[in-house]
Amino acid sequence: MSEDGGATPAPYVLDVSVLTAITRGDYGIMAFILGLDASGQPQVIPALAIAGASLDLRSDDTEAILHGLERLGSVMIAPLRDAEQAVRLAAVIARTGLDPWDAHVAAVADAAVCPVLTLNAARWREHVADLDEPLHVIEIADPDEAPGGPGPGALGPG
């Protein structure tokens, strides 16, 4: 339960496209993620997605931004904890053909039955049915629009 007595919403699992946009300085995406955090929306960032995003731009700024995301109140980092999780991740890679960072996103979303938050839903469509539970994908359709704002909505169906 959340502090206001309502049910805590299912976490969003952030994919590499969202993290990369943030590290590249996309203010709209960063503001969107900060808005989710301010509203108490839980967010999960798989550790290997952080690795994938940090490969895009190798810099101290990128590292600082990724460390900053970890400090947000509603963000939790999903580590690759042990051999069992590593073997499960390998199975996801084998079943989907995804690279390790996207496969970690898929594995976390699959295990927790949480939606993947992405900038590229098309990238995920072919993998929606590859896992034990169908992946649910939410595409950020208009990153400059505040969550719950007017118009078509900041989140679009994946």
Model regions and ranges:
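Acidic catalytic patch
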Residues: 72-95
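Acidic, PIN/NYN-like endoribonuclease modules and their adjacent C-terminal/linker elements
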Residues: 1-7, 110-158
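A short secondary-structure junction motif
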Residues: 19-28, 47-68, 90, 94-96
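Alpha-helix capping/helix-boundary segments
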Residues: 18-19, 49, 104-105, 122-124
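Metal-dependent nucleic-acid phosphoesterase active-site entry motif
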Residues: 1-27, 45, 50-51, 158
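Acidic, metal-associated active-site segment
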Residues: 99-115
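PIN/NYN-family metal-dependent endoribonuclease catalytic core
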Residues: 13-14, 30-59, 73, 77-81
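Short beta-strand scaffold positions
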Residues: 45, 80, 100, 118-119
